[in-house]
Amino acid sequence: MEKKWALVTGASSGIGLAYAEELASRGYQLVIVSNEEQAIREKGEFLSEKYGIEVLPLYRDLAIPGAAKELYDTCQEKNIPIEVLVNNAGMFFFCETLQAKANIVEKMLYLHVTTPTQLCYYFGQEMKKRRHGYILNMSSLSCWLPYPGITLYASTKRYLKSFSRGLRSELLDYGVSVTVLCPGAVATNLYNLSNNLKTLAIRLGIMMRPEKLAKKGINALFHHRASLLPGLFNKICTPLVMLLPHGLVRWIMRTTKLVKLDR
């Protein structure tokens, strides 16, 4: 029986690691990618021992030109046919766009726009030829909320949502299913919250555990869902927040001093 392979980016911790574990539990061999060299090697050993699968851990910076082609070429050289591509790698910062450092802006654009697009392009071509494959792109609930402080982040995630929906239409007739996931807050180290606050947020339904999100995401992918906004709290609150006038949002941001806004 031919081995099934999945590729997960940003897989050294958090949601990416949860995706890797979920796919490993379903019998997939793994290519896992991260810009944290020691962590990705350790996670590779951990996953291989726990699930009895073959794991190729790759130390790569996906926020630079040519990263996607290099990753694709590595899989080709090692004769690894990717059946499942999970574009999970990402970054987050909270500040006014023009206050961010230029290199950080460029890094986010590569990580959220250029590299995932190119990975879909290269691996999508192989899937199209085989007439079988799955692509899961990670957008965000914030793609509907381009507010001060997260303007660039929300906009790049909006791109991923739109790109995924269009690519899905192009590939469905070739047996390739593209799903976009738009999660809200997830209990990872991204927000620098204490464990007690994370636990409270999970109980209130404001946050979701990465393992739960990964299971929902992979289930949606294999059920050929176009998109998924997981969590009852997110489904209820997102439409309400979208109704807020931008003038009110600016006033809240200015009053709370979350970001510095010019009058």
Regions found by a protein language model. Give the residues of each.
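SDR active-site lid
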Residues: 170-232
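Conserved glycine-rich Rossmann-like NAD(P)H-binding loop of the short-chain dehydrogenase/reductase
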Residues: 26-42
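Residue(s) in the substrate-gating loop at a strand-loop-helix junction
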Residues: 140
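Active-site helix of classical SDR
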Residues: 120, 156
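Substrate-binding pocket helix/loop in short-chain dehydrogenase/reductase
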Residues: 96-97, 101-109
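Conserved NAD(P)H cofactor-binding loop of Rossmann-fold oxidoreductase domains
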Residues: 88-93
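Conserved glycine-rich cofactor-binding loop
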Residues: 5, 10-13
